A protein has these predicted regions:
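N-terminal Rossmann-like NAD(P)+-binding subdomain of aldehyde/semialdehyde dehydrogenases
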Residues: 1-119
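Short acidic-hydrophobic, aromatic-tinged amphipathic segments that line or gate anion-handling sites
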Residues: 1-7, 178-183, 303-308
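Conserved small-residue-rich beta-alpha loop and adjacent elements
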Residues: 103-169
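Glycine-rich phosphate/diphosphate-binding loop of Rossmann-like nucleotide-binding domains
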Residues: 145-162, 240-247, 251-289
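Short loop-to-beta-strand entry elements in the cores of soluble alpha/beta enzymes
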Residues: 205-207, 228-239, 254-278, 294-304, ...
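C-terminal core of ALDH-fold dehydrogenases
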Residues: 318-347
């Protein structure tokens, strides 16, 4: 991680630059895959699964037998954790549900507003080196609360043609209607256009690599709505001398291991804490299963020492991080002054 001490405000813009991605060269390849999926349906999707995920599939749909098998394979401790997470996510999002309102704008004129769940939604859950069952819950639980009648999930299988059991169990717990073994651009195309197996949906949600992001943006031009364009994941931690350096380092690494293009930033008023966090990051990094990914993303990351908390807040509002963690003595006061955070620049 790069260490920056007392940067001048005029240098903040340069200092806070995010890792850039040139996706212009991807459009031709992504467009060709989407066109093939639109024209040839399941056949094209399975061909791309063989090409990119190195698996020969007989069908795309996850069967009820596979769901039962997955449930039996998930350890009881993980089941308990998934159920607890589902309950917490449900409780939080249930409170957000819009019940509608009526307003009489003038005598005899009443306007009203109501929220209706999208009938069919598609959820994309990436594969890779770690099963993102938390993503399943965070996408599917709100969809269920909103009243979506059909929740379709696509996720890439492994080389044996299996989806990770934890993903299937989380999907079952969250109320997903149908699950398909498809990843990447071909999965986005299948949900956007519909195939013999995969239903056409009205809106697609979920993270993915740069190919998935380009595919989502391309299908959004004509076929289907999407949540939003997304970039690499990021987190900023604001901390003072009262913060626990082990916790701060763990918070930074938890985001750094998302991908090699992730970015993590510590902004602190304490040089002692900065140095302790720098040590802890290296100490904890060595014990991470995904240490190589985290180590690469730390090349994009920064430890920044500022003169006071007002400067920390100003820098934060200019950076507008996707995720922000405040670890200070007066955390509520600091949080109240942050106006630009939770801006989904990342996935």
């Amino acid at each position: 991680m790069k260490k920056i001490l007392y940067p001048h405000q005029s240098d903040w813009s340069e200092l806070l630059k995010r890792p850039t991605q040139d996706v212009s060269t991807l459009f031709e390849n992504v467009s060709a895959i989407l066109k093939n999926v639109k024209a040839n349906g399941d056949k094209a999707v399975m061909e791309y699964e063989e090409q990119f995920d190195h698996v020969k599939l007989e069908s795309l749909a996850v069967t009820s037998e596979e769901m039962k098998e997955a449930e039996a394979q998930v350890p009881i401790e993980l089941k308990v954790a998934i159920l607890l997470a589902q309950r917490n996510i449900y409780t939080f999002h249930k409170k957000q549900k819009f019940e509608g309102r009526k307003v009489e704008t003038m005598e005899g004129v009443t306007c009203w507003q109501k929220a209706v769940g999208i009938e069919k939604v598609g959820l994309y859950v990436p594969g890779g080196t770690a099963p993102l069952f938390s993503t399943v819950l965070m996408l599917a639980v709100p969809a269920k609360i909103a009243g979506c009648k059909e929740i379709v999930l696509c996720t890439p299988p492994n080389k044996e043609g299996k989806v990770h059991p934890a993903i299937l169990y989380a999907a079952q717990v969250a109320g997903v209607s149908k699950i398909f073994k498809a990843g990447g651009v071909q999965a986005i195309g299948a949900m956007a256009y519909g195939t013999e197996s995969v239903p056409k949906v009205y809106k697609i949600f979920g993270p993915g690599n740069q190919y998935v992001m380009v595919a989502k943006q391309m299908v959004a031009l004509h076929e289907v709505a999407i949540d939003m364009p997304a970039g690499p994941s990021e987190v900023e931690v604001i901390a003072d001398e009262t913060a626990n350096p082990k916790f701060v380092a763990a918070d930074l690494l938890s985001q750094a291991e998302h991908g090699v293009d992730s970015q993590v930033v510590l902004v602190t008023t304490s040089q002692k804490l900065l140095e302790e966090v720098e040590y802890e990051v290296q100490h904890q990094l060595a014990r991470l299963p995904r240490w190589q990914i985290a180590e690469k993303s730390l090349e994009n990351s920064k430890l920044i020492l500022v003169k006071d908390m007002e400067e920390a807040i100003g820098l934060t509002n200019q950076y507008a991080p996707e995720h922000l963690i405040v670890e200070t003595k007066d955390y509520m006061e600091v949080a109240e002054k942050v106006v630009n955070a939770g801006c989904e620049g990342g996935a």
